[in-house]
Amino acid sequence: NIYNNYKNLFSNFEFISKEKRNENLIFIFTGQFLGELHAPTKLLLERAYHLKKNFNKEILIINTSELLTKKAEIPFFESTFANKVDSYSNINQISYRDIEIPFYQSNTDMPDENEILNILSIVQEYKPYFILNIGSGNLTADLCSNLVTTVSFPTTSDIAISESQIHIHRSELTNKDFNLLKKTNIDPTSIVIS
C-alpha cells in the first residue's frame, strides 16, 4: 500500500523515546486549514488555544495540505479537490483570539517526498511530546507516528483510520466499529472515548 511504500522510503528515522521529547511542545497536524468559519479548522484552533492557554504548552500547527490533493490526479468524472488558502504558505503564525500560534503550511502539492522529509526532519529536530492529528487520512502524520506518539482526532463521528498510537472516538464502540478496527488492524485498546 501507499503508506508502506513511503514508510520504507523514510525508514532511516527512529522513534524518539518519551524521555528525549520536549514535554512542553505539541505539534498539531491537519490536512486542510481554511479559517475560523471552517468547522474542522475552528476545532483545531480551539484545541491549540486551550493547550496553550490552559496547559502552557508551546504549539506548532502544521498544515500538510494533503486533503483531496490534486497530486497524481485520476481523471474521474466530476472529481473534487480540497480548497487551500495559498497565502497561508507565506506566514509563520496564526492569530486566534488573544494569542499567536506558530504555523507552517506545505506549499507543494502533497504527497511530495521532499516535503514529507522536511516535516519529518522538523519533528526529529524539535522532538514534540506528541502530535495531535486533527482529521484523518494524513499520510505525513501517519509517518510521524514512527518518530513520536501521534493522537488521531477525527472531525467526523467515524473512527479515524490511521497509524496513530492513540485514537479519539466520540462515542462508545459499536459492533460495526469493532469490525472496522479488526479489518484495519487497529488495536481496540488504543481507542479513547471522549
Predicted segment positions?
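Conserved nucleotide-sugar phosphate-binding/catalytic loop shared by glycosyltransferases and other
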Residues: 74-112
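Short N-terminal targeting/anchoring amphipathic segment
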Residues: 121-137
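N-terminal subdomain of nucleotide-sugar transferases
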Residues: 1-87
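Short, charged/polar "capping" segments at the starts of alpha-helices
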Residues: 67-77, 140, 174-180
